[in-house]
Every structure is written in C-alpha cells, then in structure tokens.
Amino acid sequence: MGPAEIELDEVGDPAFLLVITHGAGGGVDAEDILAVRDSAFAAGGAVARVVQPYRVAGGRAPGNADKQDRAWLEIVAALRARFPGVPVVQGGRSNGARVACRTAVEVAAKGVIALSFPLHPPGKPEKSRRDELLATGDIEVVVINGGSDPFGVPDAADAAEVRVIPKQAHSFRTGFDVIAATVTPWFARWAR
C-alpha cells in the first residue's frame, strides 16, 4: 500500500503506546483525536498518530479492508520494535476505529479507543458492522459516539464502555472534554 506518516509524541519510559488513526475523510489533527492524544500523553503514554498509506498516496477512500488491515499491522509492528515491551493501545476515528477493532487481537492490544464507530452506513441499519466491533474478543473497547450520529451508535453491551455525547453527529463539534474524561481512566487501567 505504500508508506504511512507517523506523528510521534514521546515520553521517557512510556506507560503505554497509543497508536491512533483518522477516519476516511479526516486527518490526525481532528479535535477528538487530539483530545485522546492529550489524555494519553498526560497519563504517561507515548502517542503515534498515523496517517494511513492510502491518504499519504493521495487517496480519498481507504479501499480494501484487508489491505488496510495488513498495512496497519505492519505499522504497529514497526512501532512495537521502537517501543519494546510497552503495552499497545490502539484507536481510531470512524473508519480508523474499524481498523483498530478488526486488528486488535492480532496486535495483542491492551485496549481500543473507537471514536465515532460507524455501526452501519447512514440509513442502512441492516448493514451492521457490529461484527467488526466484536472482533476484539476479550480486549476492552471504549466507544465514544455522537447521539445524533447517522452511522448509528453501538449497543452498550458490545463494548466495555459506550459514551454517547448528546446532540453530536458523526464529526464532533463539542464534547472534547467528555472524550478526554472518558478515556483517561482507561489509559490508567491499560498502562504497565
């Protein structure tokens, strides 16, 4: 798929490594991703914000999920080599949340942060992506979605925590303090 770009925020002796990526249409500087990054950094974690290869190559859509997942696994493996023995937490926004969930078991992630997990295409609840959310097995997943998200909101029983921010659609306009407050205790739980 080609190279990715990684924006790395390091700390000495990190308690964990958060590897997080964007959605299909956004970037790693989205305010919700930055809220998670800041919380992770404050909790003693190193943070790798990943611009996926399709985006680096100029693509607008992620394309084939298998290729996207294989690329993600290579990225995480390279980061693990740089941070040996450090627990990995992975996350993403929208399409990136799907990738993080689908690959969590193979990565052996300590946990997953899923921002705006797109449960189904807008107006098509019969095309559920619940199986991707459940692909994490016993790995804890924290989902943060807007209450008005046209992509749906996962059921509370399908994740360790599902936080719904009222009056927010798929792209958050407010609630970044809620996002930070939601992820902070989970980072403490997943740290070494």
What residues fall within each predicted segment?
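Serine-hydrolase catalytic machinery in alpha/beta-hydrolase-like enzymes
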Residues: 1-87, 99
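Post-His helix in hydrolase/transferase enzymes
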Residues: 66, 173-189
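Gly/Ala-rich beta-loop-alpha elbow adjacent to hydrolase catalytic centers
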Residues: 92-100
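Hydrolases whose catalytic domains are alpha/beta-hydrolase-1, hotdog thioesterase
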Residues: 99-103, 123
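Short beta-strand/loop motif that positions the catalytic acidic residue
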Residues: 136-137, 143-145
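Conserved alpha/beta-hydrolase "acid-adjacent" motif
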Residues: 146, 150-155
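Histidine-bearing beta->alpha loop at or near hydrolase active sites
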Residues: 166-171
